[in-house]
Amino acid sequence: MIYLYTADNVIPKDGLQGAFVDKDGTYDKVYILFTVTIGSKRIVKIPYIAQMCLNDECGPSSLSSHRWSTLLKVELECDIDGRSYSQINHSKTIKQIMIRYYMYSLIVLFQVRIMYLFYEYH
């Protein structure tokens, strides 16, 4: 059984949609699907997916001893034929699609950051 530490600034308790473990032998990861609700008059729910290592033991210092050190999260954007879909309905049936989309998003984000650092320091 996996227990998730949830806090309103990381993963809101009321927005948790589901979680699953991907065991590939080398790096076992936990994927978490959740939504963040924003707004007071017009409520908007934004879907996210997060990834963290299953063996994450938190950070070494006292400030980060209760925080995940491998947590990565990204907003999900689903746009099909100009229509935007922003609700997670069935997290189990879309597991593989989410993993592929999330991994692609992380690779693109990582490449953008590398390019930014390269141009900033050269």
From Swiss-Prot:
Transmembrane segments: none
InterPro entries for this protein: Semap_dom, Semap_dom_sf, WD40/YVTN_repeat-like_dom_sf
PROSITE patterns in alphabetical order: SEMA
Record's signal peptide: none
Annotated Sema domain residues: 1-122
Leftover remarks: Variola virus encodes a likely non-functional truncated version of the semaphorin-like protein.
Protein family membership: Belongs to the semaphorin family.
Protein name in UniProt: Semaphorin-like protein A43
Organism: Variola virus (isolate Human/India/Ind3/1967) (VARV)
Gene giving rise to this polypeptide: A43R
